Amino acid sequence: MGMITYSDEDLLSLSGIQHFAFCERQWALIHVEHQWAENVKTVEGQQLHERVDDPYFTEIRHDVKAVRSTPLVSRRLGLYGIADVIEYISNPESESAIEIRIVEYKRGKPKSDDRDEVQLCAQAMCLEQMLETNIVHGFLFYGETRRRHLVEFNEGLRGRVRHLSEKMHDFFEKGITPLATKGKKCNNCSLKDLCLPSLGKNPRKATSYVSSLVKEMEEAITGDLMV
Protein backbone atom coordinates (compact mmCIF):
# COMPACT_ATOMS: atom_id res chain seq x y z
CA MET A 1 0.00 0.00 0.00
CA GLY A 2 1.45 3.36 -1.08
CA MET A 3 1.76 6.48 1.01
CA ILE A 4 -1.41 8.56 1.19
CA THR A 5 -1.16 12.10 -0.16
CA TYR A 6 -3.93 14.68 0.10
CA SER A 7 -5.02 17.25 -2.47
CA ASP A 8 -5.37 20.95 -1.63
CA GLU A 9 -9.15 20.50 -1.29
CA ASP A 10 -8.69 17.81 1.35
CA LEU A 11 -6.30 19.70 3.63
CA LEU A 12 -7.46 20.28 7.21
CA SER A 13 -6.44 23.01 9.65
CA LEU A 14 -3.25 22.07 11.47
CA SER A 15 -4.32 23.91 14.62
CA GLY A 16 -7.29 21.55 14.77
CA ILE A 17 -5.08 18.64 15.77
CA GLN A 18 -4.67 20.29 19.17
CA HIS A 19 -8.47 20.34 19.59
CA PHE A 20 -8.67 16.72 18.41
CA ALA A 21 -5.99 15.56 20.87
CA PHE A 22 -7.87 17.32 23.68
CA CYS A 23 -11.41 16.24 22.75
CA GLU A 24 -12.57 14.67 19.50
CA ARG A 25 -16.09 16.02 20.01
CA GLN A 26 -14.78 19.57 20.47
CA TRP A 27 -12.86 19.29 17.19
CA ALA A 28 -15.92 17.96 15.36
CA LEU A 29 -18.19 20.74 16.67
CA ILE A 30 -15.70 23.33 15.38
CA HIS A 31 -14.50 21.78 12.13
CA VAL A 32 -17.36 19.49 11.06
CA GLU A 33 -20.39 21.39 12.38
CA HIS A 34 -18.69 24.84 12.25
CA GLN A 35 -19.74 25.90 15.75
CA TRP A 36 -17.56 28.12 17.91
CA ALA A 37 -17.83 30.03 21.18
CA GLU A 38 -15.25 32.28 22.77
CA ASN A 39 -14.39 32.41 26.42
CA VAL A 40 -11.76 34.36 28.32
CA LYS A 41 -9.09 31.77 27.59
CA THR A 42 -9.64 31.71 23.83
CA VAL A 43 -9.58 35.52 23.69
CA GLU A 44 -6.36 35.66 25.72
CA GLY A 45 -4.84 33.07 23.42
CA GLN A 46 -5.74 35.12 20.36
CA GLN A 47 -4.22 38.25 21.89
CA LEU A 48 -0.98 36.38 22.63
CA HIS A 49 -0.77 35.20 19.03
CA GLU A 50 -1.45 38.69 17.68
CA ARG A 51 1.86 39.78 19.19
CA VAL A 52 3.80 37.26 17.10
CA ASP A 53 1.60 36.97 13.99
CA ASP A 54 3.43 39.53 11.85
CA PRO A 55 4.42 37.82 8.56
CA TYR A 56 6.68 40.73 7.62
CA PHE A 57 8.75 40.64 10.79
CA THR A 58 12.16 38.98 10.76
CA GLU A 59 14.56 39.32 13.66
CA ILE A 60 18.27 38.54 13.64
CA ARG A 61 20.17 38.22 16.91
CA HIS A 62 23.72 36.94 16.86
CA ASP A 63 23.53 33.62 14.97
CA VAL A 64 19.73 33.26 15.18
CA LYS A 65 17.29 34.42 12.50
CA ALA A 66 13.65 34.36 13.69
CA VAL A 67 10.85 34.42 11.11
CA ARG A 68 7.23 34.85 12.18
CA SER A 69 3.96 33.45 10.78
CA THR A 70 5.39 31.03 8.24
CA PRO A 71 2.78 29.09 6.19
CA LEU A 72 3.02 25.32 6.58
CA VAL A 73 1.60 22.42 4.59
CA SER A 74 1.95 18.64 4.51
CA ARG A 75 0.15 16.59 1.89
CA ARG A 76 1.20 13.42 3.69
CA LEU A 77 -0.57 14.49 6.87
CA GLY A 78 -3.20 16.47 4.97
CA LEU A 79 -2.68 19.54 7.15
CA TYR A 80 -2.02 23.23 6.61
CA GLY A 81 -1.40 26.07 9.04
CA ILE A 82 0.95 28.71 10.39
CA ALA A 83 4.09 28.45 12.53
CA ASP A 84 4.29 31.24 15.12
CA VAL A 85 8.09 31.49 14.97
CA ILE A 86 10.75 29.53 13.11
CA GLU A 87 14.33 30.04 14.22
CA TYR A 88 17.25 29.36 11.90
CA ILE A 89 20.43 28.93 13.95
CA SER A 90 23.88 28.95 12.43
CA ASN A 91 25.66 25.80 13.59
CA PRO A 92 28.90 24.98 11.74
CA GLU A 93 29.15 21.68 13.61
CA SER A 94 25.92 20.28 12.12
CA GLU A 95 25.75 18.56 8.73
CA SER A 96 23.52 21.26 7.23
CA ALA A 97 25.27 24.16 9.03
CA ILE A 98 21.78 25.42 9.95
CA GLU A 99 19.67 24.16 12.85
CA ILE A 100 15.90 24.76 12.63
CA ARG A 101 13.63 25.21 15.63
CA ILE A 102 9.90 25.89 15.81
CA VAL A 103 8.42 27.94 18.67
CA GLU A 104 4.68 27.89 19.42
CA TYR A 105 3.15 30.50 21.75
CA LYS A 106 0.45 29.46 24.22
CA ARG A 107 -1.46 31.21 26.98
CA GLY A 108 -1.47 29.83 30.51
CA LYS A 109 0.93 27.12 31.59
CA PRO A 110 1.93 23.61 30.44
CA LYS A 111 -1.00 21.19 30.12
CA SER A 112 -1.39 17.83 31.83
CA ASP A 113 -1.93 16.16 28.44
CA ASP A 114 0.03 16.24 25.18
CA ARG A 115 -2.22 18.40 22.99
CA ASP A 116 0.30 21.26 22.69
CA GLU A 117 3.18 18.89 22.00
CA VAL A 118 1.12 17.18 19.28
CA GLN A 119 0.42 20.49 17.54
CA LEU A 120 4.07 21.57 17.70
CA CYS A 121 5.27 18.21 16.36
CA ALA A 122 2.75 18.40 13.50
CA GLN A 123 4.17 21.81 12.58
CA ALA A 124 7.69 20.39 12.58
CA MET A 125 6.67 17.45 10.40
CA CYS A 126 5.11 19.86 7.89
CA LEU A 127 8.25 21.98 7.77
CA GLU A 128 10.46 18.90 7.45
CA GLN A 129 8.57 17.82 4.34
CA MET A 130 8.63 21.33 2.88
CA LEU A 131 12.39 21.80 3.38
CA GLU A 132 13.40 18.12 3.13
CA THR A 133 15.22 18.34 6.42
CA ASN A 134 15.10 16.87 9.92
CA ILE A 135 13.96 18.81 13.01
CA VAL A 136 14.75 17.09 16.30
CA HIS A 137 13.03 19.42 18.78
CA GLY A 138 11.09 22.64 19.26
CA PHE A 139 9.75 24.85 22.04
CA LEU A 140 6.41 25.78 23.61
CA PHE A 141 6.36 29.27 25.15
CA TYR A 142 3.64 29.82 27.77
CA GLY A 143 2.34 33.29 28.59
CA GLU A 144 1.87 32.50 32.29
CA THR A 145 5.28 30.99 33.00
CA ARG A 146 7.13 33.19 30.48
CA ARG A 147 9.41 30.25 29.77
CA ARG A 148 10.23 27.99 26.86
CA HIS A 149 9.59 24.29 27.30
CA LEU A 150 11.60 21.85 25.21
CA VAL A 151 9.69 19.27 23.15
CA GLU A 152 11.57 16.33 21.63
CA PHE A 153 10.08 15.08 18.37
CA ASN A 154 10.56 11.37 19.07
CA GLU A 155 8.96 8.57 17.08
CA GLY A 156 6.22 8.08 19.68
CA LEU A 157 5.03 11.67 19.30
CA ARG A 158 5.37 11.55 15.52
CA GLY A 159 3.32 8.36 15.41
CA ARG A 160 0.57 10.01 17.47
CA VAL A 161 0.49 12.95 15.04
CA ARG A 162 0.08 10.57 12.10
CA HIS A 163 -2.64 8.58 13.88
CA LEU A 164 -4.62 11.68 14.89
CA SER A 165 -4.38 13.30 11.46
CA GLU A 166 -5.67 10.11 9.79
CA LYS A 167 -8.55 9.92 12.26
CA MET A 168 -9.39 13.61 11.72
CA HIS A 169 -9.66 13.04 7.97
CA ASP A 170 -11.85 9.97 8.52
CA PHE A 171 -14.22 11.90 10.82
CA PHE A 172 -14.32 14.89 8.46
CA GLU A 173 -15.02 12.78 5.38
CA LYS A 174 -17.81 10.85 7.11
CA GLY A 175 -19.21 13.88 8.98
CA ILE A 176 -18.76 12.18 12.36
CA THR A 177 -19.36 14.07 15.62
CA PRO A 178 -18.66 11.80 18.62
CA LEU A 179 -21.14 11.70 21.48
CA ALA A 180 -20.38 13.79 24.55
CA THR A 181 -18.48 12.27 27.46
CA LYS A 182 -18.45 14.45 30.56
CA GLY A 183 -15.15 14.95 32.37
CA LYS A 184 -13.02 17.51 34.22
CA LYS A 185 -11.78 18.95 30.93
CA CYS A 186 -15.33 20.09 30.13
CA ASN A 187 -15.33 22.77 32.86
CA ASN A 188 -13.26 25.36 30.96
CA CYS A 189 -14.21 24.32 27.42
CA SER A 190 -15.45 27.21 25.28
CA LEU A 191 -18.05 24.90 23.69
CA LYS A 192 -19.55 23.56 26.92
CA ASP A 193 -22.96 25.16 26.35
CA LEU A 194 -23.08 23.89 22.77
CA CYS A 195 -21.71 20.44 23.55
CA LEU A 196 -23.99 19.72 26.54
CA PRO A 197 -21.67 17.11 28.08
CA SER A 198 -24.03 16.53 31.01
CA LEU A 199 -26.36 14.68 28.63
CA GLY A 200 -23.58 12.25 27.79
CA LYS A 201 -24.61 9.00 26.14
CA ASN A 202 -27.76 8.61 28.25
CA PRO A 203 -30.78 8.64 25.89
CA ARG A 204 -33.18 9.38 28.75
CA LYS A 205 -31.32 12.57 29.64
CA ALA A 206 -31.24 13.63 25.99
CA THR A 207 -34.95 12.89 25.54
CA SER A 208 -35.81 14.78 28.72
CA TYR A 209 -33.73 17.78 27.62
CA VAL A 210 -35.36 17.96 24.18
CA SER A 211 -38.82 17.55 25.73
CA SER A 212 -38.15 20.47 28.09
CA LEU A 213 -37.10 22.66 25.16
CA VAL A 214 -40.27 21.77 23.24
CA LYS A 215 -42.39 22.52 26.32
CA GLU A 216 -40.72 25.93 26.74
CA MET A 217 -41.39 26.76 23.09
CA GLU A 218 -45.04 25.70 23.38
CA GLU A 219 -45.50 27.82 26.50
CA ALA A 220 -43.86 30.81 24.81
CA ILE A 221 -46.11 30.46 21.76
CA THR A 222 -49.22 30.08 23.94
CA GLY A 223 -48.24 33.16 25.92
CA ASP A 224 -47.79 35.22 22.74
CA LEU A 225 -51.22 34.17 21.46
CA MET A 226 -52.88 35.22 24.72
CA VAL A 227 -51.36 38.73 24.66
What are these regions (language model features)?
Residues 10-18, 114-115, 177-184:
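Structural motif
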Residues 20-22, 105, 141-142, 209:
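Aromatic side chains
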Residues 13, 21, 25, 119, ...:
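Alpha-helical structural motif
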Residues 62-166:
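Mg2+/Mn2+-dependent nuclease catalytic core
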Residues 75-76, 128-227:
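Metal-dependent nuclease catalytic regions and adjoining charged, substrate-binding loops involved
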Residues 14-15, 26, 83, 117-121, ...:
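Non-catalytic, well-ordered alpha-helical scaffold segments
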Residues 1-102, 202, 214-215, 222-227:
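Metal-dependent nuclease catalytic cores that hydrolyze phosphodiester bonds in DNA/RNA
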